[in-house]
């Protein structure tokens, strides 16, 4: 005959559930918020550990309402995994809203991308490191172009920046 005994692990299960709930609430309530009260969009930024301009770009993104999780990584495998063609690569790769952002793309272009959600593209890129792109900020200003790219490496012009933002 089996005696009625408390279920083993009940205390642990309740404790785990409570801690999970408290952790989730803290994470949600602790996130930076936009003026409308919505949580700031979060981006994952992969960067080479030795690159300083990448942090300047992260500062640009966070100053424009984004939350950034920065991961120092070997960039070759990251670019392969996210299908960034060699000709379109830059110093860091960012993931946000299902898109890949390659390099020093202005926050305003990312905002537009997330609003429009165009079909058939993987993301935006500024190949190389244009001197006047956010995070580089070399004076005098030098115009630069932001491109979309798809899985086959085809590009289209997304934005032309002819003056400082």
Region locations from a protein language model:
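Iron-sulfur (Fe-S) cluster-binding segments and ferredoxin-like electron-carrier domains
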Residues: 60-66
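Conserved redox-active cysteine motifs that mediate thiol-disulfide chemistry
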Residues: 48-56
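Thiol-based oxidoreductase modules, predominantly thioredoxin-like and allied folds used
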Residues: 68-79, 88, 96
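C-terminal segment of N-terminal export signals and the immediately downstream linker at the start
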Residues: 32-48, 78
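Thiol/selenol-based redox catalytic cores and closely related redox-interacting motifs
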Residues: 84-165
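Short active-site oxyanion
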Residues: 42-43, 67, 98-100
């Amino acid at each position: 005959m089996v005696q009625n005994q408390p279920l083993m692990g009940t205390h642990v299960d309740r404790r785990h559930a409570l801690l999970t709930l408290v952790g989730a609430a803290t994470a949600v309530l602790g996130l930076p918020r936009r003026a409308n009260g919505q949580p700031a969009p979060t981006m994952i930024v992969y960067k080479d550990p030795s690159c300083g301009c990448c942090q300047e770009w992260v500062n640009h993104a966070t100053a424009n309402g984004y939350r950034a999780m920065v991961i120092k990584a070997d960039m070759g495998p990251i670019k392969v995994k996210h299908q960034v063609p060699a000709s379109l690569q830059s110093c860091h790769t960012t993931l946000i809203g299902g898109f890949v952002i390659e390099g020093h793309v202005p926050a305003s272009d990312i905002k537009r991308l997330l609003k429009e959600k165009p079909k058939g593209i993987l993301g935006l890129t500024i190949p190389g490191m244009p001197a006047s792109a956010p995070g580089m900020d070399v004076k005098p200003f030098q115009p630069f172009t932001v491109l979309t790219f798809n899985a086959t490496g085809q590009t289209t012009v997304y934005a032309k920046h002819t003056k400082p933002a």
